[in-house]
Amino acid sequence: MKTELKAVLKRPKISEKFDELREKKEGALIGYVMAGDPTFEASSEVVKALAKGGADIIELGFPFSDPVADGPTIQVAGQRALAEGMDIERYFAFARALEVDVPLVCMTYYNPVFRYGVEKFVENAAEAGISGLIIPDIPVEEAADLKTGCDAHGLDLIFLVAPTTTEARIRKILQRGSGFIYLVSRLGVTGARDDVAGSTKELLSRVNTDIPKAVGFGISTGEQAAEVRKAGADGVIVGSAFVRIIEEGTDVNERLETLARELKSGMLEAN
């Protein structure tokens, strides 16, 4: 057990990763996958493939039966993970055992966190080598207990900002959030789209902060990643495009690595 914990603690924090990338004038590729999809063993290889392809940070989804912010691709991924027997204890064991040296971010919903116990969830997440939490269905005004727990255990609490987010709420998010700010490039649920919304640049300009800004909800190609990087984003977040490859089930790891390289290359070319 002590050996496992030493390996976990070597993972960099989110802020350390962004500092490293900023020195190299690179944007962060943040890849999302559902833990346990399609199986526990295969999911571990999926995470390795993303890291090998150039993912700088990996969002590790924990499935929930009512995922209000997820599009159909990620909803089905959650169903597959639940069918495999994913639960919170197995999720933390899975995260702890991952052989990757990039920051891990847990993305889930508030219901399972609340039912498990906020303090216990945050403590166990930290022990599993997780660096941050994204819980899209909890408003910043109601996240005091979660923020306290995250601060106590050295985790970043990452909030979402959408085009409809008010200036007052953005100010609160910038006061209480850390790690990076998750900017929603389009309204609605997650999913790959044919183009990146024109409101992305305007949204970036509204969020005045030294906290890194990452744009998600609709990016699936290197060209789109370059567009977002040119608009001023510190990172791009890609989920559905990766999860769709997993769902298709053909040459999964090779295709994931290839797409990650394409996305990372797009951002590098935008410098």
Curated annotation (Swiss-Prot):
Gene3D superfamilies per UniProt: Aldolase class I (3.20.20.70)
Record bears the keyword Cell inner membrane: no
NCBIfam families per record: trpA
Disulfide bonds: none
Protein name from the UniProt record: Tryptophan synthase alpha chain
Active-site residues annotated for this sequence: 59, 70
GO-annotated molecular function: tryptophan synthase activity
EC number: 4.2.1.20
Protein's gene: trpA
Family, per entry: Belongs to the TrpA family.
Lyase as UniProt keyword: yes
Cellular component GO terms, alphabetical: cytosol
Quaternary structure, from the entry: Tetramer of two alpha and two beta chains.
Native species: Methanosarcina mazei (strain ATCC BAA-159 / DSM 3647 / Goe1 / Go1 / JCM 11833 / OCM 88) (Methanosarcina frisia)
Free-text function comment from the UniProt entry: The alpha subunit is responsible for the aldol cleavage of indoleglycerol phosphate to indole and glyceraldehyde 3-phosphate.
Pfam families in the cross-refs: Trp_syntA (PF00290)
